[in-house]
């Protein structure tokens, strides 16, 4: 980095990051070792946009799909741009994927919820021991009130994502599909001290419009082990094993029963699929073979990938080059990893969409 050699010096990652950062418009010299070859780079420092929408495309003629990874300050803007493109393409239904979305900006969750709800529909409210109830309702000016919506959630869906899912469910606006969400619904306020430090104090909790508390309980000191215990108790694979607090019974706008006790319980349960995680898949994950393969494909097909601008073209190109054969050859050559008889047939439908997605991120496709 610059004139300093850091390879082999055990330089901490945060120190390397500080060395590479600097005023916008200035340059930093890097020497990168790629596949055994040292390659020099002169990089101009600038703001790097981090997008929150991982994917937005039409599944068929009338169904759109959007994957939202986090709620950032630009989420609403990105979401509006994505839905505008999908509406122009004929979208009548939307699959909104909030799996593993840990939340983020509260106001963005409110604005996204508002897009789907009628005037005065409840979105969420907050209330605490020393904090009076504060309601947040829709204003009816959303542009997606007539779009059918299905929301995908899982145990990694938390905070702002749960606010959105709870609002959709309690207003009977759409269908929630997946597994019980994380259960993170605390309202915290920062208190700053004169020495520059600070502390965040919990002052209230978030509740869905029907009155369900999103925050899961802290009982038995098992808060940090909750997800592990869900696996152990079979909740991830069987709806019958899902813990439901039957005493915390609430009703949606149309009178459907919903239960509190922490997190959002889906309308349609989808078990986690463990049958496709073969030993070959697990070993590839441990060594990040999929990510390194994607980078190698970019190096090899940089010219082609840089011209692909739509999903159909990307899919046709991937089919034409036999991506499966390329990946299996790469795994065997670089890590001596080969699927046992029958393993690839089991795991191919699990691995290849991930691999194609990683390669596709190097294209010009939004």
Where are these regions (language model features)?
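Short clusters of small/polar residues that mark proteolytic maturation junctions
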Residues: 10, 43, 128, 203, ...
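A generic structural motif
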Residues: 31-35, 207, 251
């Amino acid at each position: 980095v610059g004139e300093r050699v850091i390879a082999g010096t055990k330089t901490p990652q945060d120190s390397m990051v500080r060395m590479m950062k600097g005023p916008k418009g200035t340059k930093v010299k890097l020497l990168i070792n790629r596949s055994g070859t040292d390659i020099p780079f002169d990089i101009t420092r600038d703001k790097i946009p981090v997008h929150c929408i991982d994917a937005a495309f039409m599944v068929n003629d009338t169904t759109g799909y959007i994957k939202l990874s986090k709620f950032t300050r630009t989420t609403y803007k990105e979401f509006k741009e994505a839905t505008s493109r999908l509406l122009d393409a004929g979208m009548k239904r939307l699959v909104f994927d909030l799996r593993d979305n840990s939340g983020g900006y509260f106001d963005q969750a409110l604005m996204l919820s508002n897009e789907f709800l009628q005037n005065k529909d409840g979105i969420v409210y907050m209330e605490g021991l020393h904090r009076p109830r504060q309601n947040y309702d829709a204003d009816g000016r959303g542009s997606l009130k007539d779009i059918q919506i299905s929301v995908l959630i899982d145990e990694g869906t938390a905070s702002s994502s749960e606010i959105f899912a709870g609002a959709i469910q309690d207003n009977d606006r759409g269908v929630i599909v997946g597994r019980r969400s994380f259960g993170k619904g605390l309202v915290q306020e920062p208190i700053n001290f004169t020495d520059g430090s600070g502390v965040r104090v919990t002052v209230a909790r978030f509740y869905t419009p029907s009155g369900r508390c999103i925050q899961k309980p802290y009982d038995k000191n098992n808060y940090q082990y909750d997800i592990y215990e869900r696996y152990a108790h079979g909740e991830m694979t069987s709806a019958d094993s899902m813990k439901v607090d039957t005493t915390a019974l609430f009703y949606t706008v149309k009178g459907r029963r919903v239960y509190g006790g922490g997190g959002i319980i889906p309308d349609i349960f989808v078990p986690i699929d463990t049958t496709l995680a073969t030993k070959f898949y697990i070993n590839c994950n441990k060594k990040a073979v999929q990510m390194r393969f994607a980078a190698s494909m970019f190096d090899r097909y940089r010219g082609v990938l840089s011209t692909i601008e739509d999903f159909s073209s990307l899919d046709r190109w991937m089919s034409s080059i036999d991506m499966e054969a390329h990946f299996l050859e790469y795994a065997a050559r670089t890590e001596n990893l080969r699927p046992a008889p029958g393993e690839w047939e089991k795991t191919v439908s699990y691995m290849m969409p991930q691999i194609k997605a990683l390669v596709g991120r190097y294209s010009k496709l939004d």
